[in-house]
Every structure is written in structure tokens, then in C-alpha cells.
Amino acid sequence: MPTWTEYIFQRKLGRAPSPGDVVEVVPDLVGFHDLTGYHVLEVLESMGKVEVFDKGRVVVAFDHLSPPPTQRAAEIMVYIRKHVKALGLPNFYDVGGGILHQIILEKYAMPEYVIFAADSHTNTAGAVGAFAHGMGATDIAAALKLGRTWVVVPAPFRVDVRGEFPPGVMGKDVALHLLKQFGAEGFNGYSVEVFVERPKAFPMDDRATVANMSTEMGADALMFIPDEVTADYLQRERGVSYKPPSLEPGRYVDRYEVELQRLEPLVAAPYSVDNVKAAREVEGVEVDQVFIGSCTNGRLSDFEVAARVLKRGRAKARCIAIPASYAVFRRAMELGYIDVLTKAGCVVTYGTCGPCLGGHFGVAGPGEVVVTTSNRNFKGRVGHPDSKVYLANPATAAAAALEGKIVDPRPYLAP
């Protein structure tokens, strides 16, 4: 019987490919953002008449340079807007709309979809069981014009998740645990398929975090096998009915088991995503700035946890909080999370990638220590090359903001 990866490709190709095969696939969705969109459209222009295969299958979002921090960024946005208007693309999200990956997850991604976008964290949509894969500008331009592009069929790797999250542990810690076990290139050439033993114990927001950070693991894709949580999410968020197919277990090149109860809050210390330690091992490291947000941890439950911690007082470190989409921002406001964060001294804004890539809205200075819920911590990632970046879950990040140093977040989540 097929694995989930094989099942998706069989439906697309009408045949069963083997790992390593180079195949042409018709995508269900193609996306790009402001930082990559300029290059995508340049390539599209070089191919002759500027046109797309299906306007309804294209998603464009301004997120990396949003709102534009430089004149050049503003020029890029003007250029992209002109093309979006000329092409008549309906799924366009201008400044304030949110981060591309979150928008795709909220509004468009479906189980069994094949999604290609011009960004490495396209994998995020694997949270709902889509084969979502990042590509370069040339390949995305070809997909936009021709309605198809090539992909190497990855080998399937199975991960079984058992148990429930203990207090203070979140999807980010599952991702960091996998990075510690397999390294930053451990899943190169693999499509990771995650089976959750107790689906309701692993919410969609946490699934999105793990899928997002599979990029850091080298995975071509990471997909949570659709279950009742997937179906509930699609019904609640979009009013779409979905019944997960019943598949017999397929054959995997390897497998690994994660026991959630055995995990604790983790951090990735400078300067590598797989330099993973328990948060308690680095307690006391003084922190200058905290960032809660990004396509990794900018969802509603992330801000609920951050608010639970920061309601205890005013942050001692600079704190920047950025919901990943307008929808998350609005809901966080309605539930009072934004009020708690601003009272704690956090600077809050609409969805932007700015601090994550060291572009704007929170660039780190020389020697500064940053705790962030984003996905990368190599030298210079969030600003000055002499800054130090720790990756953490939202509870750990919020506790670091509150105390001005890294601490174990679990005591701060007690009632």
C-alpha cells in the first residue's frame, strides 16, 4: 500500500513513482512574496507574454519587506502590484495581510494538495497533509506560466508521535528535538510523514510549527497524516468538509518515535539550529531582545501562551510580538492577548517577517542576545554578525522577555 507521499503523487501522475524519480507535476497552488516575487516576475517576463496558468491557484503576499523599510523595497512592491493588477490575480495580500505561509495555511492549503512557492518555508502547509515544497524563482515562474514544474520524488520517512505535551512543551520543542537527533541535514531527500497517536493532543498550530521547521532539517516536505484534527480545522476555519482517506501502512525507508511526555522546553543555541539544549541548561543568559512571531510561531495559541506568561509583569528585555496574519492579529485582540502584551511593554505590529531575517522592525546590534520563536540562528540572521540568537518556543521566549534572561518557562505557566 502507498505511503502518504506516494498516494499524493499517484493521484497527480496516474502512476506510482519511485523515490528519486524526476517527475512533472501540476501544482494545486503556487505562491511568492515580495522578496522573491521581483525575481519570479523578471523570469516570467523573460519567457515572453506575462501570463499565469490559473489565476485562482496563485497566492501573493507582501511579508518580508512589509511595510517597506527602504525606497528600494517600496519600488519592488510597486513593480509587483502592477503585475498583480495586470494579471488580475485575486489572491493578493498587500501590507498588513500577513506572512505568505500562514495565509496559505489559513485560507488555501488542503490535504493531498501539491503546493510550490518561492520560499524555503513553504513546507508549513504540510500541517494539513499537503505536499508543500519551496523552490527558486525560475522554477516558480515556470510553474506559473506552464502550470507544471519538475520535482524529485523524495523517499518517505515515518515519525510516530505518542502521548501528550507536558506543561511548557510545544510543537517547537518537537522540531528542536528532531533537529538534535538528526541534525540540520538529517532529512535531506526525505518526505517526512508524521502519524499522531492521539490527534487531539497535537493541535494544528503546533503541527504548523513542526512542518515549518522541517526546512531546517533538510526535508523536501513534512506532512502530518490527515486525521480528525485536520478535518475539524478545515471545517472550523473554512467551512470545508473533509474525510481523511483510510490507507493501509506503507513502506518507509526508516522511522522514528517521539514520546511527548519525555520532552522539555528546548532552545537552539548559537549558531546552529541543531545546537539544541534544554532551556534549563542555559538559564541565566542575559537577553537584550525577544521576538515572538514569524511563520514558525506567530499563531493564536502561541500568543495565548505568551500572554499567560507576560500577564505576570512588565518585560525586562525588549519584546517584539508579531502575529503571522491579520486574522491571527484580530483574534488575538478579541481575546485580550494583544492587550496583555502591550501592557507588558511589547511592541506589536501586523504580520511581517522583518525581525526574523534581520531586515527591519527589530534588527539586533553588535553583541546583543536575542531569543526568538523564529526558525534560524546562524551568524547575522537577525542583524549584526556579532549578535547571538537562541531559538525557543513562545513560553520560553515570553519568560525570557519577562525576566531579561533565559529561564525555564514552566514555573511561569502555573495557575
UniProtKB/Swiss-Prot annotation:
Keywords: 4Fe-4S, Amino-acid biosynthesis, Branched-chain amino acid biosynthesis, Iron, Iron-sulfur, Leucine biosynthesis, Lyase, Metal-binding. GO terms for biological process: L-leucine biosynthetic process. Pathway: Amino-acid biosynthesis; L-leucine biosynthesis; L-leucine from 3-methyl-2-oxobutanoate: step 2/4. Its cofactor is [4Fe-4S] cluster. InterPro entries: Acnase/IPM_dHydase_lsu_aba_1/3, Acoase/IPM_deHydtase_lsu_aba, Aconitase_4Fe-4S_BS, Aconitase_4Fe-4S_dom, HAcnase/IPMdehydase_lsu_prok, Homoacnase/IPMdehydase_lsu, IPM_dehydratase_rel_enz. SUPFAM superfamilies: Aconitase iron-sulfur domain. Its EC number is 4.2.1.33. GO terms for molecular function: 3-isopropylmalate dehydratase activity; 4 iron, 4 sulfur cluster binding; metal ion binding. Belongs to the aconitase/IPM isomerase family. LeuC type 2 subfamily. Heterodimer of LeuC and LeuD. PANTHER family: HOMOACONITASE, MITOCHONDRIAL, HOMOACONITASE, MITOCHONDRIAL-RELATED. This is 3-isopropylmalate dehydratase large subunit. It comes from Pyrobaculum neutrophilum (strain DSM 2338 / JCM 9278 / NBRC 100436 / V24Sta). The lineage of its organism: Archaea, Thermoproteota, Thermoprotei, Thermoproteales, Thermoproteaceae. The gene is leuC.
